[in-house]
Amino acid sequence: MKGGSHMITRADKEQEIKLITEKFGKAKGAFIVDFKGIKVEQVTNLRKKLNAADSEMKVVRNTLAKRAFKDHPAIETAFANSMKGTNAIVFSYGEVNATAKALADFAKDVEVLQIKSGVMDGAALDDAKIKFLATLPGKDQLRAMLLGTLLGAGSALARCLNAYAEKMGGGAAAGTEEAPQA
């Protein structure tokens, strides 16, 4: 290896393809992003945000990624037109909308990051779907909203029952007091 070039052996390529294939198998969703022009410290910051969203970003060679897609036809179809240029795959192992939100928020601050395409549950995600997905609340937030609604409805019911009981109790007491006077 003269001149500092980095040659990848066939075994290295096969190992990389196997690794990407395994990551797709574990992921609930994935995104292709173009990170050309992003500074190293920005990439580090993005990786931290993605880790917080139970996701990871892997810089891949397009040819190796395409070979890894062969085991995942839905992903191959979804990413068919995205594998040009400087790409990374973002694997989402948790809530896919949290990953989409992390990417969308980062892309607002660092405009050179392009979210090219995504896939979730075997369905392709275009730009509009990814932006919509990023606006959805996560499972924990939805659970909190549901719990708040249930508790609110329960306390409203309790207040109604108490008011009804007081009214009935107050009306009966007034009726019994008036009866002896008349």
Swiss-Prot record:
Pfam families xref list: Ribosomal_L10 (PF00466)
Keyword Repeat: no
One Gene Ontology MF term: large ribosomal subunit rRNA binding
One GO term (biological process): translation
Xref: SUPFAM superfamilies: Ribosomal protein L10-like
GO cellular component, one term: ribonucleoprotein complex
Alphabetic keyword roster: Ribonucleoprotein, Ribosomal protein, RNA-binding, rRNA-binding
Subunit structure: Part of the ribosomal stalk of the 50S ribosomal subunit. The N-terminus interacts with L11 and the large rRNA to form the base of the stalk. The C-terminus forms an elongated spine to which L12 dimers bind in a sequential fashion forming a multimeric L10(L12)X complex.
Family: Belongs to the universal ribosomal protein uL10 family.
Function in brief: Forms part of the ribosomal stalk, playing a central role in the interaction of the ribosome with GTP-bound translation factors.
Name the UniProt record assigns to this protein: Large ribosomal subunit protein uL10
Organism, scientific name: Bdellovibrio bacteriovorus (strain ATCC 15356 / DSM 50701 / NCIMB 9529 / HD100)
Lineage: Bacteria, Pseudomonadati, Bdellovibrionota, Bdellovibrionia, Bdellovibrionales
